Every structure is written in structure tokens, then in C-alpha cells.
């Protein structure tokens, strides 16, 4: 039995995923994580550094790493890449002025060797706000169709209501699970 098969069998028993949540500041990363964990979202502070939460979802243990998105913290993102199974990239779909910056940061991340093979879930958050950019336009600006190095999918969502969050996380778990675990 090859080494890779042994590793896959070990991970199959653990059924654990490491998920990194990144995006520009004020995109809604922490609110999305708290909503998914069914925690209160009425008092959210900017994440200075990182926060780790663990939740069981779809027979998996998800270790969610919420990392601050302020410009001064982005150079530290690379410290969290190791052993990442999936990347959730959160976009503020109401922030037209920073969409190009958002695209540039995502492109840098996708070039990182330690993130190679990680599934990419793009969450176009704040889709409920007036003037929010539609998901197809966001996909176009982010040039998602050109991504060949990662499995990816984009969902519009609303962190405050939780709209489409379970659907998005289900896709992510199914995608990662089909690649790195021996499914029953």
C-alpha cells in the first residue's frame, strides 16, 4: 500500500478539514463564521490576528480559521497556509471601490504553493444590500473562469441572515471530502 493511500485512510478516520477564511477587511468573514456556528452576530469587532473555531457539519469536523483582513495583517496570511484543505474567500459585494483590490489579493493567494489543491469557495457577501454587485459580475472581475489550479465555486450570500451559507458550506465539504477522504 502506497504512502498516499495510508495518509488518506488515516484522514478518513479523522474526517477533519482545515478551512481558512480570508478576505479584505470588513467583508464579513467573522460574521459569516459566527452565523454558521449559530453564535450571536450583534457585536462583531474587527479580527486582529486570527480566531479558530471547530464545528461538526456533514459528518466532518471543520476547523475554521478566521484571519483578519486589514492591510497591515495581509503579509501574515502566509503563516496560516500550511495543511489548508479549503479557502473561503469573502467578498463584500457592496464595495465596488475595492473589488479590483480584492481580485489582486485573491490572485496572490492562488499562486501560493502551500494552498495548491485547496478548494476555493468564494462568498459574495452582503448581497442583500442596495447596489450590491451580482455574483456573475463578481466572478468576472475575480476572473474565476481562468482558475485551473483549484476547484472553485461562488455563492452570493448574506452573513446576517445566513442566506445560502449552508448550501455553500455543503458544496465545500462535498468537494474537499471527495478529494481527500475515502467516502463511505
From Swiss-Prot:
It comes from the Eukaryota. A lipid is attached at residue 2 (N-myristoyl glycine). Keywords: Cell cycle, Cell division, Cell membrane, Cytoplasm, Cytoskeleton, Developmental protein, GTP-binding, Lipoprotein, Membrane, Myristate, Nucleotide-binding. One of its GO terms (molecular function) is GTP binding. One of its GO terms (biological process) is cortical microtubule organization. InterPro entries: Arl2, ARL2/3, P-loop_NTPase, Small_GTP-bd, Small_GTPase_ARF/SAR. NCBIfam families: small_GTP. GTP-binding protein that functions in embryogenesis, cytokinesis, germline development and microtubulule cytoskeleton dynamics. Belongs to the small GTPase superfamily. Arf family. This is ADP-ribosylation factor-like protein 2. It comes from Caenorhabditis briggsae.
